[in-house]
């Protein structure tokens, strides 16, 4: 079974007019224009509308959905597919990500100040993973550049970037979500469904570190559920992780001349219901923004990279370690976020590593230790990371060293 929804070019045209008339807002986290492309997402040249499939009829090719179009030289979003970004995102081996959402005509996303926004039936969220191209040292590995993403926009220039995969989350008629991974073909013109996941040999080049070869992992359905079953009371289904008000309350450079707060943009597009304005909207820090406090940056990073499992309804709830935004930094029960907390199951390297966080002692804190290692027994997050996020680890270390809570006994 599949459903066709009409193109929504009139909504985007109206939004573009509104964008041009509005005062530009400075982009959070250094978006500063679009290096990946420009302009309002174009209509698919074939005139094909976005097509939503149910879980039993998912197509083998990404192009069948008409979310994106690639001619091998440039990837663009179809009409009605809206790009977005997050203040602080999940680290995925330095991959860049073009996030986008689609809402059926006449439907709206329910605004919430806490938790994932409420997407209507027939909605889709897609995330394309890609890297800046680079010259590696081994023909068996694709060379890609090590960098932290700053580019935004509505398209990807494939002369400068290499597509790896696109993940699609679709809200089904029964209200549940289905996740599907598509791996981009060698010619970069389409992507193929890989239900069982896949491995892509990559070599990170430059960025202040030694070249690093690794197997980039495209998740299978079971792996997807490990993270996306968060906040569902025991994994009774999966949910999107990123699209929360506090993550999306930031500016986005839709093209070189148009930058606007994303929540306001969705509201202007008539895609958001119940929105009360950015003055009352929660906001996460950008972990890279050194004008923010270390605590705000650390809370945002742990919330985006750890809390999908380390929350009361997540897969790591049994650990007793809660790393969600509301919990980290509280002084009433700091053990909940790891302070002087011994691990329940993780054996670890032994002394002097005793606690998740030892205030003022990042070098012996297990939280940072696990973020600095990639061995299966040690790595955290347990899914989606094969290399270390050196810059973020340094920030987390600085935060732990800044803590002035009582020393652990």
Regions found by a protein language model. Name each.
Residues 2-17:
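Bacterial N-terminal signal peptides that target proteins for export
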Residues 22-51, 409:
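Bacterial Sec-dependent N-terminal signal peptides
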Residues 34, 230-233, 312-315, 346:
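Secreted/processed peptides and extracellular or luminal domains of membrane proteins
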Residues 37-100:
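N-terminal pre-domain segments of enzymes
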Residues 87-92, 96-300:
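Extended surface/linker regions that mediate inter-domain or inter-protein docking
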Residues 223, 305, 379:
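The −1 position to Zn-ligating cysteines in a subset of zinc-ribbon hairpins
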Residues 250-299, 308-314, 320-409:
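Electron-transfer interface patches adjacent to heme c in soluble/periplasmic c-type cytochromes
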